Amino acid sequence: MIMSSKEVEIIWHQIISEVEILMDQEPELAGFYHAYILQHDSFDMALSYILSNQLSNKVMSTVFVRDIINKVYIACRKIVAYAIQDIKALFNHGLVHCYSFSLLHSKGFHALQAYRISNFLWCEEKKSLALYFQNRISCLFSVDIHPASMIGSGIVLDNAIGITIGQTSAIKDSVSVLSQSLALLGSAFKISSVQCPKINEGVIIGANVAILGNVVIGEKTKIQACTVVLQSVPPNSIVTSVLAKIVSFKNINE
């Protein structure tokens, strides 16, 4: 369900209130809070400012990157609503103590919002620009999300280092990755028409999980840490296993 513009405004004003309190508590950060939050008239303007300062470089200036992001937000307001839902998901899981923390400090949140820009550009056939954003996301956050992958709203990427999401992956709403190193990739050695996993709504994924191949993870499934998933999982399951199989062996004494 996409949030209304009124709901977005409610969260934005809550963020402003939180930042004003934080600024009173630590006035040394007044310039930081003003630049990132208080000088902006809307949530999407603040988010585009934050992302553009991260994704720019010496060739692609901050002003140029911000102009691209602002145009995306104007063309697709759904992306802004998704960002708010992602912030709420982090808060509702108890991973942050206030809404403003995610917007200001969460690299998983920032990587996800930058992916949403790249996905829009990819769908608009601006694939080289989308791949530029993918590369910047990978370099900055150690997160590799293909621009063509499909990711819903209310997504939690906590401690996002090492997350890899392949081109044909699909992640529905309210999916949580509660620690680092998730791999959603096609099966190895199958080059043509590689199909990546499909993750249904409400799935919770632990640390260091690999989900490989054309598999479907049923809704509200919990995948525990250090699990390798190679086959589809029915809804409402709890999955735990570490798979290893010798595919060839050479006697070193031969």
Curated annotation (Swiss-Prot):
GO terms for molecular function: serine O-acetyltransferase activity. One of its GO terms (biological process) is cysteine biosynthetic process from serine. InterPro entries: Hexapep, LbH_SAT, Ser_AcTrfase_N, Ser_AcTrfase_N_sf, Trimer_LpxA-like_sf. The keyword Repeat applies. It is found in: Cytoplasm. One of its GO terms (cellular component) is cytoplasm. Pathway: Amino-acid biosynthesis; L-cysteine biosynthesis; L-cysteine from L-serine: step 1/2. It is an enzyme of class 2 (transferase). It catalyses: L-serine + acetyl-CoA = O-acetyl-L-serine + CoA. Pfam families: Hexapep, SATase_N. Keywords: Acyltransferase, Amino-acid biosynthesis, Cysteine biosynthesis, Cytoplasm, Repeat, Transferase. Its EC number is 2.3.1.30. It comes from the Bacteria. Belongs to the transferase hexapeptide repeat family. This is Serine acetyltransferase. It comes from Buchnera aphidicola subsp. Baizongia pistaciae (strain Bp).
